[in-house]
Amino acid sequence: YYMIQETMTVGDFLLFTLLLSEVNPPFDAGNDGNLLLARVDKLLEFGALDPAAALLDQAGPEDPALFRRWFDVSLLIGREDAACMTMQSNPKITLSLPARIFCLARQGDWNAAALTLNSAEAIAALSDEELALLRHFLESELPNEKEALPSPITPLVFKLTEAVGEPLPTFGLPLAFSVTDI
């Protein structure tokens, strides 16, 4: 993230410095974690994945909102196995079927991943785009034509397209995705 600092305006640099500061939340901030989530979101906007990961690691991914961000950051920095193990040890932490299917497959349980995908399709729990991408990921068959991608592009969609041999260019995506180009 030192390259990021060189291209920042003075105001952004000061904000970035504040985001990295070790501080206690204000007394009237409550215990909902919104300040931490805002800090992490802004770090991700700056493309500073390592500091965001450090904040999330320190807080722990026990809260669903924290886990979602921790999972996304883990995918972008190549720690998807740790994220999937955390999800497996605490299945209530996420309701994201695509993430569950991805992790089941990553951990080698292809049958459970396929069963989960088929169940999600039967109850119409996923969009057509998500179904097509996950089916392509699980079945490793080449699609007849270019499938539309789910919108917006999430770190999971980004990782799935990479896994099927069709990586997305990072141009036009949020800055956090560009870490994969380095």
What are the roles of these predicted feature ranges?
Residues 1-182:
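Alpha-helical solenoid repeat scaffolds
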